[in-house]
Amino acid sequence: MDKRITLIGSKIAKTGNEFIYCGVLEECSECRFKKICHDGLIVGKRYRIVSVRSAKHPCIAYGDGVKVIEVEPSNNFTILIESKKALEGLTLSHSDIQCNNILCKYYNLCHSEGMPEKYKIMELHEKIKCPKGNSLIKATVSTIN
């Protein structure tokens, strides 16, 4: 695994949480922790927190401070896919479900950020009752390198 040490806001520094790295903020330019926060992370990539250290450090961007965490690239994602494409072991090219209902409780699963271009369906879960009538299934998928 490609594990890295970085910093993240104390409130979201929990083992198992995932985040998408969005790049260096303007507030970070003069910070003494800039290098540890940003070096080695790839913009747009999703990371999973594998451990959290107890020490808390001050941060201008995160008013509640930051904690040191160990992260690894997240290779498994839970998303919604069209039922007609739902077959375990199948390799697919990613495309979001066509829907603009941002208030839908499934929106983030239909429009999952940080998704790889291609993935393999690892496990199928329950059928989803889509408010727009789309035939969808929740699935765990894995990145294909």
From Swiss-Prot:
It comes from the Archaea. It holds the Pfam family UPF0179. InterPro entries: UPF0179. Belongs to the UPF0179 family. This is UPF0179 protein Maeo_1037.
